[in-house]
Amino acid sequence: GAFAAIGQTNIKRLMAYSSIAHMGYALMGLAAGTAFGLQALLIYMAIYVTMNIGTFAFILSMQKDGKPVTDIASLNMLSRSQPGKALAMLVLLFSLAGVPPMVGFFGKLYVLRAAFDAGLAWLAIAGVIASVIGAFYYLRIVFFMYFGEEQEIGLDVSKSPVMSSFLMASAIIMVVGVANLFGLEGLAAAAAQTLVQ
């Protein structure tokens, strides 16, 4: 999934391919075959779903002259025309890439540690490599939003309060959740113990 997403210019396809890579990370926890591995899986999935809600709310709001747009180049200098929206997406992309201190970083850390502790060091190393590759295509989107070429007519300003709310709420969770993951660690640990008993 990580390799397939590299050359994509369609943001929907890019995110679809990246989803394959993210499922791979989640399955590392399952492959560990331990209670901690299940805990890591549950934490990762909760974080990933939250990130995806915001990301796809952003994608669905991408329109030009009232028509849906999927080309990544259409995001050129979005930070200038819609700074709040661009910043929220930047936070989500950094979190998806696993950049510290975003919550997505801790999600990846959990599954990588679970794999390593279970003696699957090769799998953890493969996960780190895939994460580095993934960071490339996520940061490419950030580049377009902040350093791309100027456009005479940018994307339409979203008029959907629901999509905007999902985007902003997801981004805020990725930042604020760093404090204690909203108690997710304890809940996931309890659920994992129940599942292995």
What are these regions (language model features)?
Residues 1-197:
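Alpha-helical transmembrane segments of multi-pass membrane proteins predominantly involved
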